[in-house]
Structures are given as C-alpha cells and as structure tokens.
C-alpha cells in the first residue's frame, strides 16, 4: 500500500502538468470578483 501511494504521488505532478497555466491564473480570480462588484455598483449608481 505504501509503495502504491508513493507511486501515485510521483505521478500526480506529471498528470497535472497540463493545468499549470490554469494554476497560475487562479489567484487572480478574487480580484475579478472585486472589479465585478465595483462595475455592478457603478452600473446602479452606487445606491
């Protein structure tokens, strides 16, 4: 069982290599929510 889990951990980085650019973008998503809130308030006139 231990050998299987070590083998699985060794394969995961290669399996997720294609998602590298997505992982780089993920931390920026909360900033987009902040900008969305500002644009929404601007569209309703900051009530």
UniProtKB/Swiss-Prot annotation:
Predominant localisation class: membrane
Membrane topology term: Single-pass membrane protein
UniProt subcellular location: Cellular thylakoid membrane
Keyword line: Membrane, Photosynthesis, Photosystem II, Reaction center, Thylakoid, Transmembrane, Transmembrane helix
One annotated Gene Ontology cellular component of this protein: photosystem II reaction center
Residue spans crossing the bilayer: 19-39
Pfam families: PsbK (PF02533)
InterPro entries: PSII_PsbK, PSII_PsbK_sf
GO biological process: photosynthesis
Source taxon at top rank: Bacteria
Residues cleaved off as propeptide: 1-10
Coiled coil start-end: none
SUPFAM superfamilies according to UniProt: Photosystem II reaction center protein K, PsbK
Family classification: Belongs to the PsbK family.
Cited function: One of the components of the core complex of photosystem II (PSII). PSII is a light-driven water:plastoquinone oxidoreductase that uses light energy to abstract electrons from H(2)O, generating O(2) and a proton gradient subsequently used for ATP formation. It consists of a core antenna complex that captures photons, and an electron transfer chain that converts photonic excitation into a charge separation.
Subunit structure and binding partners: PSII is composed of 1 copy each of membrane proteins PsbA, PsbB, PsbC, PsbD, PsbE, PsbF, PsbH, PsbI, PsbJ, PsbK, PsbL, PsbM, PsbT, PsbX, PsbY, PsbZ, Psb30/Ycf12, peripheral proteins PsbO, CyanoQ (PsbQ), PsbU, PsbV and a large number of cofactors. It forms dimeric complexes.
Protein name (database record): Photosystem II reaction center protein K
């Amino acid at each position: 069982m231990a050998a299987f889990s070590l083998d699985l951990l060794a394969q995961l980085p290669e399996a997720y290599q294609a998602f590298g650019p997505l992982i780089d973008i993920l931390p920026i998503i909360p900033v987009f929510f902040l900008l969305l809130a500002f644009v929404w308030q601007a569209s309703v006139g900051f009530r």
